[in-house]
Amino acid sequence: GAIKDALKGAAKTVAVELLKKAQCKLEKTC
């Protein structure tokens, strides 16, 4: 349903942001 799709989209966005933060910390590019 629409709600499930919205939650999936939000979860993906959050995961991407967390990955970006983790990556910049590892590479010290923050």
Curated annotation (Swiss-Prot):
The keyword Disulfide bond applies. Expressed by the skin glands. GO terms for biological process: defense response to bacterium. It holds the Pfam family Antimicrobial_2. One of its GO terms (cellular component) is extracellular region. It comes from the Eukaryota. The keyword Zinc does not apply. Keywords: Amphibian defense peptide, Antibiotic, Antimicrobial, Disulfide bond, Secreted. It is found in: Secreted. Disulfide bonds join C24-C30. InterPro entries: Antimicrobial_frog_2. Belongs to the frog skin active peptide (FSAP) family. Brevinin subfamily. Has antibacterial activity against the Gram-positive bacterium S.aureus ATCC 25923 (MIC=18 uM) and the Gram-negative bacterium E.coli ATCC 25726 (MIC=18 uM). This is Brevinin-2PTa. It comes from Pulchrana picturata.
